[in-house]
């Protein structure tokens, strides 16, 4: 199986969350079908055609785009689906941009997996992060996605403004009830060019220590995996954009954040097993 990534930086996202700098990075760029086609072509020479291959739209809230632009971006992917080069499509979006009409459009273009940027299910935390939606939007979106038969992934965060460890634990309990197929876990970092950078500089926000971020992420990881929910990533990708000089202002950065989280999870599991 090969996942062919297609990046549409910040496309379709109407809000500037306090921790996000994508508007600063990508400006007002608009994705096009030609952009998608060029990105796909970079990978096609390296993969064997087959139904297990998947095109994946990353970096924006895809269903927040106008329907005609979504259709345009799907055009190169539709061709690969028709030719049998790939078998499905996945994408990420906001929970408040899920409705029946949008999901019918996704189904018409081979989308089988939808990831929701949830971050937290605590309305106070969502408001502090200026997410622009509430927890009820997540519950409605997951319910509708299940009705339409999509595989569902949820993206979660620890260390957000106004987010205590108890808040994280409460979010996890709600996630277990929602029952997604998989999840990602990210520690919040203070990134250059974000509103959170200014909040941090004013002394109004204190990020988690690395130790605390590992502890909280390991808790989330353990709860999810023990419930049969696969955690497909822990920590941000340590790429050039993130790790460039001065880009990380503060916060619990580790280039392989998943490793100490996995170790903490395994150590706790072994301790419980021998009690």
What feature does the model see in each segment?
Residues 13-17, 191-197, 242-244:
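Short acidic/His/Gly/Ser-rich catalytic and metal-binding motifs that mark active-site loops
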Residues 25-38, 44-46, 58-184, 188-214:
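Conserved non-cysteine loop/helix-boundary elements of the Radical SAM core domain that shape
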Residues 230-266:
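Conserved mixed alpha/beta catalytic, RNA-binding, or beta-rich assembly cores of soluble enzyme
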Residues 1-35:
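Canonical Radical SAM [4Fe-4S] cluster-binding loop centered on the CxxxCxxC motif
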Residues 9-12, 186-191, 237:
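Short glycine-enriched loops at secondary-structure junctions
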Residues 221, 225, 232-234:
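Helix-loop elements that line ligand-binding/catalytic pockets
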Residues 264-274:
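Conserved small/polar residues in nucleotide/adenosyl-binding loops
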């Amino acid at each position: 199986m090969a996942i062919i990534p297609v990046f549409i930086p910040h496309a379709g996202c109407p809000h500037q969350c306090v921790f996000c700098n994508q508007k600063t990075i990508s400006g007002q760029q608009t994705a096009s079908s030609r952009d998608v086609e060029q990105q796909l072509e970079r990978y096609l020479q390296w993969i064997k055609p087959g139904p297990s291959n998947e095109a994946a739209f990353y970096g924006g809230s895809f269903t927040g785009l106008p329907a005609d632009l979504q259709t345009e971006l799907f055009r190169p992917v539709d061709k690969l689906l028709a030719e049998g080069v790939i078998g499905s499509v996945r994408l990420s979006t906001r929970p408040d941009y899920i409705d029946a009409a949008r999901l019918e459009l996704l189904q018409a273009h081979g989308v089988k997996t939808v990831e929701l940027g949830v971050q937290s299910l605590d309305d106070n935390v969502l408001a502090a992060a200026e997410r622009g939606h509430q927890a009820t939007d997540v519950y409605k979106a997951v319910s509708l996605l299940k009705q339409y038969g999509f595989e569902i992934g949820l993206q979660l965060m620890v260390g957000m403004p106004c987010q205590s460890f108890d808040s994280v634990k409460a979010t996890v309990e709600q996630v277990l009830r929602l029952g997604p197929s998989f999840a990602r876990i990210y520690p919040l970092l203070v990134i250059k060019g974000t509103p959170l950078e200014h909040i941090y500089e004013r002394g109004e926000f204190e990020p988690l220590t690395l130790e605390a971020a590992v502890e909280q992420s390991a808790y989330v990881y353990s709860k999810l995996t023990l419930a049969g929910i696969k955690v497909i990533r822990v920590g941000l990708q340590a790429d050039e954009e993130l790790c460039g000089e001065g880009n990380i202002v503060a916060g619990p950065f580790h280039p392989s954040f998943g490793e100490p989280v996995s170790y903490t999870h395994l150590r706790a599991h072994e301790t419980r097993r021998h009690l």
